[in-house]
Curated annotation (Swiss-Prot):
Disordered: annotated span: 228-248
Native source species: Arabidopsis thaliana (Mouse-ear cress)
Function as written in the Swiss-Prot or TrEMBL entry: Catalyzes the adenylation of flavin mononucleotide (FMN) to form flavin adenine dinucleotide (FAD) coenzyme.
Name of the molecule in the record: FAD synthetase 1, chloroplastic
GO terms for biological process, alphabetical: FAD biosynthetic process; riboflavin biosynthetic process
Principal location class: plastid
Listed GO MF terms: ATP binding; FMN adenylyltransferase activity
Keyword 4Fe-4S: no
Keyword Metal-binding: no
Upper taxonomic lineage: Eukaryota, Viridiplantae, Streptophyta, Embryophyta, Tracheophyta
Matches recorded under InterPro entries: FAD_synthase, Rossmann-like_a/b/a_fold
Cofactor(s) needed: Mg(2+)
Localization of this protein: Plastid, Chloroplast
Record key words, sorted: ATP-binding, Chloroplast, FAD, Flavoprotein, FMN, Nucleotide-binding, Nucleotidyltransferase, Plastid, Transferase, Transit peptide
Pfam families in alphabetical order: FAD_syn
Length: 354
């Protein structure tokens, strides 16, 4: 077996202190880690689905797309793309500091992967909504986590939700063990899985033990306020603060609280726009974009200072951004906007808030 048939070991990581960049305030339980076989110590080759596919002729901000799309192949033994690895479980919509903490713990044990599901909205009939992180920008974010993860950028591996929706908790863990051949899993204390979310973290631990893989559960990551005291004098924003979550990020974006968004994400929020070159207009340092050109969720209507515009491989340009219902305006001190390549039909621009 990939994990040497070792009995599952369970660890609880405590995060009662607010996380800081580079901080690793942890409390580990007394259980001992049983090491997996040597295969889990290697960088397992993967044929994971690419997250940065764009039409060939579309240029892009350098740090968003130019890192190159790695397409590692399956090993000669035909192993699963995540075989022998430590898999973090979650939805990973926002790639916030709570998600990063899962990746950090996975990297402490072995080769880190993020296992997420695609197609949930279509299967469950949810109303379509813009992602928090543009799909083409996810690799950049994960690469920025390498410094927290032993200089290894976590790899994101996707599974079609329709293919696992019907699985009960036991069948799901069996898939992780026997089909995907993972060595261990990391999940948050509120993680739910299986058909109709019938399984919880404690059942995950029990089932992983039954199937001979390790399970690691971490406490919820809280924002800097940690605990919200609900009083009548408390404003609506402070009532919303507490556990870091993708929902909280969406609420903060809608409220235009980009400082709080930066805290939750552990980085400034970046919006990517895909616009026809001929539609990019600049008058006296003012660039106008239609919100329909945005590939991910912008902050709510308002004026945002201390922003940055990223164009191709050029240095970020300081700017002010005005967001309204149908347009996004970028104001810079440069009188004229220089396209990275005017021969291209489309331009991809990055706008960073805060």
């Amino acid at each position: 077996m990939l994990c040497g048939g070792s009995r599952a070991s369970v660890h609880l990581w405590d995060h009662r202190h607010p996380p800081r960049l580079g901080a690793k305030v942890l409390r580990k339980s007394s259980f001992m880690l049983r090491p997996c076989s040597a295969i889990s110590q290697q960088r397992i080759k993967s044929s994971f689905r690419s997250h940065c596919k764009t039409p060939r002729k579309i240029p892009a901000p350098l740090d968003c797309f130019s890192q190159g799309d790695d397409h590692p192949e399956l090993s000669a033994e035909g192993l699963s793309p995540v075989a022998g690895g430590i898999v973090a479980l979650g939805k990973f919509d926002a790639l916030h500091i709570g998600h990063r903490e899962l990746a950090i713990q996975a990297a402490r044990i072995g080769t880190p992967y993020l296992l997420s599901f695609v197609g949930l909205a279509e299967v469950l009939g949810w109303k379509p909504r813009a992602p928090i992180v543009a799909k083409c920008d996810r690799k950049r974010v994960l690469s920025s986590w390498a410094s927290y993860c032993g200089n290894i950028a976590p790899v994101e591996f996707e599974i079609e939700f329709a293919s696992v929706r019907h699985l009960n908790p036991q069948q799901f863990v069996e898939k992780l063990s026997r089909e995907l051949r993972v060595c261990g899993v990391v999940a948050g204390e509120n993680y739910r899985f299986g058909y109709r979310a019938s399984g919880d973290a404690s059942e995950l631990v029990r089932l992983c033990k039954d199937f001979g893989i390790s399970a690691y559960i971490i406490n919820s990551v809280m924002d800097k306020n940690q605990v919200s005291v609900n009083t009548e004098e408390e404003d609506s924003k402070s009532k919303e603060r507490g556990q870091v979550s993708s929902t909280r990020v969406r609420h903060a974006l809608a409220a235009g609280d980009v400082r709080y968004v930066t805290e939750l994400l552990g980085r400034p929020h970046r919006v990517i726009s895909r616009t026809r070159t001929q539609d990019l207009t600049s008058k006296r340092g003012r660039i106008s974009l239609q919100t329909s050109s945005l590939l991910n969720l912008p902050p709510g209507n308002g004026v945002y200072k201390a922003c940055s515009l990223i164009v191709g491989d050029k240095h970020p340009i300081s700017c002010k951004v005005i967001v309204d219902t149908s347009n996004l305006y970028i104001e810079t001190e440069e009188e004229r906007f220089h396209n990275s390549d005017e021969s291209q039909e489309f331009q991809l621009l990055g706008i960073e808030f805060g």
